[in-house]
Design a protein with these regions (language model features):
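Alpha-helical membrane insertion/targeting regions
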Residues: 2-174
Length: 174
């Protein structure tokens, strides 16, 4: 049964790519994307342009993140019950909603810039702890997700399983 599922979800050309080469490309793409985001948010600055659409993007971002979380949890439940194709569909959809979030986030911050935190007291170090861990893990999670997908679609299910056990909690956190 497992081999039949693997045959359905593997992509033949990915089987031909050596894992080290695939992971190298994943790391390169992820690194370039992270550098672009750092520049966009912290160095480029905002724009004077403002609209209702731009100001509504944080709500859309929250909706997309919540949707991704629910899809990831459904995907986890599906794989735990042996429904591998359902698991794959939930995770691919979670990836799409996460990508849409990232696009919306980039658009918002390209117009709005960064927002300084003005809170005081105990909440300030708590906020910065969450922010710093979020930034670090969000830089790490993209290559982790792409590696998980590569391993799954190239038929390396054992390694996919091991990588995904670490990837899922990080993805849920960020």
């Amino acid at each position: 049964m497992q081999n039949k599922i693997e045959d359905q979800i593997t992509i033949d050309f990915l089987k031909q790519i050596h894992p080290a080469k695939a992971i190298g490309v994943i790391l390169l793409i992820s690194g370039l994307a992270c550098m672009f985001l750092l520049w966009l948010i912290y160095y480029k600055g905002g724009s004077d342009y403002s609209s209702n659409l731009i100001s509504s993007l944080p709500a859309l971002n929250a909706l997309l993140n919540a949707t991704s979380t629910v899809l990831l949890l459904f995907g986890y439940k599906a794989v735990r019950s042996g429904r591998y194709l359902t698991h794959m569909r939930f995770n691919l959809t979670a990836f799409v909603t996460s990508a849409l979030f990232l696009i919306s986030y980039v658009v918002y911050h390209s117009f709005h810039g960064s927002t300084p935190f003005t809170g005081e007291g105990i909440i300030r170090p708590v906020y910065f702890f969450i922010l710093i861990t979020h930034i670090i893990l969000s830089a790490l999670v993209m290559p982790m997700i792409l590696t998980s997908f590569y391993l799954a679609f190239s038929g390396k299910t054992g390694t996919h399983r091991k990588v995904s056990k670490v990837t899922l909690p990080v993805w849920l956190y960020v």
